[in-house]
Amino acid sequence: MTPDLTQSAITPARLTHLQRLEAESIHILREVAAECERPVMLYSIGKDSAVMLHLAAKAFYPSKPPFPLLHIDTTWKFRDMYALRDRIGSEMGFDLLVHKNPDAQARGINPFDHGSAVHTDLWKTEGLKQALSKYGFDAAFGGARRDEEKSRAKERVFSFRSSEHRWDPKNQRPELWNLYNTRKHPGESLRVFPISNWTELDIWQYIHLENIPIVPLYFAAERPVVERDGALIMVDDDRFRLRDGEVPQMRSVRFRTLGCYPLTGAVESTAATLPQVIQEMLLATTSERQGRVIDHDQSASMEKKKQEGYF
């Protein structure tokens, strides 16, 4: 006798919004691991990188991911970021590579003497290109999301790079549904963005749901800041150069995005828990990257940086 199947038994479980995003990202991670010879995951220590690491751990569990982490070190990150980087690398079992541009290091490039554009180009863009060439990586996972910024909004999930690591936004490959093209000539590479379709809200909800460790700078606390050019800049160490008349003030602030500390503005906030951060984000009327000084170097500066090889 044929058993009577209930409707619940024959209807597939309905995935939540976050579960669908998670499944898509895991599919992308596995696709690259299967199709590319030497992939790497870029690790900037921010909330998006934290989510990518968590997804990678899930995608290949119980084995460790078949690719290393790569951190491009500018030497100017927040101290809390370095502390988390060193702890996470060892706790999660990832192979962590750290690269510093030797030319920028020898010349003492910094955001105070050389400005944000030169600092970013030499430490980040050139440093990344050096590391990718040095280790021969043919695919690099990045944590960029389409809702962050207009040039990222139009970039493909699988983003083709020339042998000089350059991006041509007018010559992008079509992407149909979940079919991805990883073919490339020797010397060429891909930048792959597994969380491209996630929003800032998705990221925070997933971090809350999965209990993912993040840098404490995302939570409000009393911190020493100066108001400079319309931004609240945190005085994180004794290398910070105060201008005439500037006196650090203790204010309750947090960061929505993280980069080099002299180039990253905080926002005044009392959100000290994940639910409070999510609630504050839902009510925000400003961009997530409003505090990133490098985004305001010139018109369309992010797209120009990406064309030259930036993350």
UniProtKB/Swiss-Prot annotation:
Read off the SUPFAM superfamilies from this record. Answer: Adenine nucleotide alpha hydrolases-like (SSF52402)
GO MF terms, alphabetically ordered: ATP binding; sulfate adenylyltransferase (ATP) activity
Pathway membership of this protein? Sulfur metabolism; hydrogen sulfide biosynthesis; sulfite from sulfate: step 1/3
Q: Which EC class does it fall in?
A: transferase
The biological processes this protein is annotated with in GO are: hydrogen sulfide biosynthetic process; sulfate assimilation
Q: Which InterPro entries match?
A: PAPS_reduct_dom, Rossmann-like_a/b/a_fold, SO4_adenylTrfase_ssu, Sulfate_adenylyltrnsfr_sub2
What does the record give as the reaction this protein catalyses?
Answer: sulfate + ATP + H(+) = adenosine 5'-phosphosulfate + diphosphate
The coiled-coil segments of this chain are: none
Q: What is its EC number?
A: 2.7.7.4
Per UniProt, the keywords (alphabetical) are: ATP-binding, Nucleotide-binding, Nucleotidyltransferase, Transferase
Q: List the disulfide bonds.
A: none
What is its biological role?
A: With CysN forms the ATP sulfurylase (ATPS) that catalyzes the adenylation of sulfate producing adenosine 5'-phosphosulfate (APS) and diphosphate, the first enzymatic step in sulfur assimilation pathway. APS synthesis involves the formation of a high-energy phosphoric-sulfuric acid anhydride bond driven by GTP hydrolysis by CysN coupled to ATP hydrolysis by CysD.
Per the record, the similarity remark reads: Belongs to the PAPS reductase family. CysD subfamily.
Recorded protein name is: Sulfate adenylyltransferase subunit 2
Which organism's genome codes for this protein?
Caulobacter vibrioides (strain ATCC 19089 / CIP 103742 / CB 15) (Caulobacter crescentus)
Gene that produces this protein: cysD
